[in-house]
């Protein structure tokens, strides 16, 4: 196991702890109250901030990913330590997201210091969609790897969470999950050439999504649904309305009924082509990629949903400095958050090697922007 600790990190830890305590003392709302306010369209005390940090947590705390990949205890410990440094209002920690598919026997690469990658299709042939069933995420005997990579980590972090950061259930979205199982290019071809086949694949995938989300949501505070294949960069509005929206809407309805949680929906790339339809899914907050103009997004969705984003994760958060981060963060707030209904974050997951100080700089902007 590789663990790095130095005086610089210790000094940052002490400084961040003091600053976070000062900010917390100035807060007039809890994180849960703040989230509820932005969803309802009420003004919170300040701008909430989400670090969208996953593998970043392991790297920042001095660990190689292979030592964290399936270790819930270590993952929980370093996530809590990381959050003490950054002060994020939300956390989900270092999840090995391809584990969602490993119990199916698909090939998944396992690089030492990066996420695994799904390398093979579960539904390679058309007839596989009907013949090959998926595992039951709520049955521990059928979902061993999914639990090791995702659910066990979520549950372990909740037990040690000392900062009050909000925790989430997690699963890939429906069309993204179907893309992993069928292959994205094959699935997109199915939507055009064999739509009934595409619907069958997505319908089965939606049941897997539902189970994975429910397996990790008990005791949580919100739900996080990344659905990158739903991007307007990949599909058009008509495809989104037919093959993603109705399935996502049904899941969201069920989750809200059973958990009462707010739903954060993240879509990569350009979502402007599908933006007007996204609120129809029933989600509460769209986490927007850095590729879009938040002001344009706000104009399209109005007050139907809250927006989240979208500081450039590479150019600014990873490679920028404190001044660049402050300017970019304020630009995001002014574009979409002057009247509330907004969470400040990166415009996608924070890159692995992003300095803690840069993440902290974004946190400080949100925590100092009061209403």
Language-model features, listed with the residues they occupy:
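Intrinsically disordered, low-complexity segments enriched in small/polar residues
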Residues: 2-8, 103, 114, 162, ...
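Compositionally biased amphipathic helical and low-complexity segments enriched in hydrophobic
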Residues: 2, 13-15, 83, 135, ...
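Active-site loop segments of alpha/beta catalytic cores
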Residues: 20-21, 26-59, 63-68, 78, ...
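N-terminal amphipathic/basic-hydrophobic helices that include classical n-h-c signal peptides
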Residues: 1-25
């Amino acid at each position: 196991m590789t663990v790095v600790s130095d005086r610089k990190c210790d000094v940052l830890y002490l400084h961040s702890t003091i600053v976070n305590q000062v900010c917390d003392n100035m807060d007039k709302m809890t994180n849960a109250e703040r989230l509820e306010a932005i969803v309802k369209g009420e003004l919170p005390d300040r701008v909430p901030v989400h670090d969208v940090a996953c593998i970043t947590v392991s790297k920042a705390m001095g660990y190689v990913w292979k030592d964290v990949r399936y270790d819930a205890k270590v993952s929980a410990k370093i996530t809590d330590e990381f959050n003490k440094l950054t002060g994020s209002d939300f956390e989900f920690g270092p999840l090995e997201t391809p584990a969602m598919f490993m119990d199916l026997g698909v090939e998944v690469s396992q690089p030492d210091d990066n996420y695994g990658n799904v390398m093979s299709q579960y539904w390679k042939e058309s007839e596989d969609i009907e013949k090959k069933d998926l595992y039951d995420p709520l049955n521990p005997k059928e979902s061993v790897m999914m639990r090791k990579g995702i659910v066990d980590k979520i549950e372990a972090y909740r037990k040690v969470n000392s900062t009050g950061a909000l925790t989430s259930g997690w699963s890939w979205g429906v069309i993204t999950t179907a893309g992993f199982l069928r292959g994205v290019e094959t699935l997109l071809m199915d939507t055009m050439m064999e739509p009934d086949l595409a619907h069958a694949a997505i319908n089965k995938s939606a049941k897997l999504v539902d189970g994975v989300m429910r397996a990790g949501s008990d005791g949580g505070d919100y739900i996080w649904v990344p659905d990158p294949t739903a991007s307007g960069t990949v599909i058009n509005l008509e495809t989104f309305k037919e093959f993603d929206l109705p399935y996502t809407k049904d899941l969201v309805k069920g989750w809200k009924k059973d958990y009462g949680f707010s739903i954060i929906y993240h879509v990569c790339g350009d979502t402007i082509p599908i933006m007007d339809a996204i609120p129809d899914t029933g989600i509460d907050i769209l986490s927007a990629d850095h590729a879009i103009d938040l002001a344009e997004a706000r104009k399209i969705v109005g007050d139907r949903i809250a927006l989240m984003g979208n500081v450039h994760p590479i150019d600014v958060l990873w490679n920028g400095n404190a001044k660049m981060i402050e300017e970019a963060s304020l630009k995001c707030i002014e574009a979409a958050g002057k009247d509330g209904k907004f969470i400040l974050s990166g415009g996608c997951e924070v890159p692995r090697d992003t300095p803690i100080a840069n993440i902290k700089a974004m946190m400080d902007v949100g925590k100092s922007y009061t209403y």
